[in-house]
Curated annotation (Swiss-Prot):
It is found in: Cell membrane. GO terms for cellular component: plasma membrane. InterPro entries: TPM_dom. The gene is ydjH. Keywords: Cell membrane, Membrane, Signal, Transmembrane, Transmembrane helix. Residues 1-29 form the signal peptide. It comes from Bacillus subtilis (strain 168). Residues 223-235 have a biased composition (Basic and acidic residues). This is UPF0603 protein YdjH. The keyword Nucleotide-binding does not apply.
């Protein structure tokens, strides 16, 4: 009996000792999660490293995986089904996936779970239109970087709100802040006079708008969305994976 209790105590102690180590390994696995699957060899190792780092950092802030897949061919499978199969096998939770099929020169962007709500068909169309010219010019790194940045930005704006709205632009907010500040200063001088301690920046909303859930300024490069006529075979293409997960989508040629 004593031997049994001795073994039981040993097992319990071993479990408590191993738990912190298992937690560390889980964190490491999360940090090392792959986000770029360049099967078509469109990127250099350095470019892959930069995209992995950007995706991991911005993805952690939005609790969303930003995935990039390039393939020489989908072997006859529709690109939307190809993307859905990937999510069924490897995806979990909120995920955005950009897939490039080099044989058919086709691009597809999909949003799953929370990303399906925040990256709806309309927002994905806007993102795809913005990166289309870079894809056509074989500037793949720039296109993928912009996809991550715009997806990150749109994931911070409540569903149903147009992310291209003029109120979200920094220059409009600056002009509005200066105008409001100028009016306030004029009123104060007219009624009271004295030392002026108010300026335009006093009234500028640094968080852009109350419709934004989370907004920080990690993105260092200025990303401008481009409006271009849609190709005849492009547009919204949401659906459901074979595994039963619904998604938003946008597809087109480049």
């Amino acid at each position: 009996m004593r031997g049994f209790f001795g073994k039981a105590i040993f097992v319990v102690l071993a479990v408590f000792i191993m738990m912190p180590l298992l937690g560390i390994e889980a964190v490491r696995a999360s940090e090392l999660q792959q986000h770029v699957y360049d099967r078509a060899h469109l990127l250099s190792k350095a470019e892959i490293g930069k995209l992995e780092s950007l995706s991991a950092k911005l993805g952690a802030k939005r609790d969303t995986d930003f995935i990039i897949i390039t393939t020489k061919s989908t072997n006859g499978e529709d690109i939307a089904d190809y993307t859905g199969d990937f999510y069924d096998r490897y995806g979990k939770g909120s995920t955005a996936i950009l897939t490039i099929d080099m044989t058919n020169r086709e691009v597809f962007i999909a949003g799953f779970k929370k990303a399906e709500q925040y990256l709806d068909n309309s927002r994905l169309n806007s993102i795809r239109n913005t990166i289309s010219s870079d894809l056509s010019n074989e500037n793949y790194f720039e296109a993928f970087e912009t996809y991550i940045q715009l997806s990150y930005k749109d994931m911070g704006i409540k569903p149903g709100v147009n992310p291209d709205n003029i109120f979200f632009t920094w220059w409009f907010q600056l002009i509005a802040a200066i105008a409001v500040g100028g009016i306030a200063v004029s009123i104060m001088l007219y009624h009271a006079g004295g030392k002026v301690t108010v300026n335009g920046s006093t009234y500028m909303d640094q968080r852009t708008s109350d419709v934004i859930d989370q907004y920080d300024t990690y993105i260092r490069t200025t990303v401008t969305r481009e409006r271009k006529p849609s190709d005849k075979d492009s547009g919204s293409d949401g659906g459901v994976t074979k595994g039963g997960t619904s998604y938003s989508g946008s597809r087109g040629s480049f």
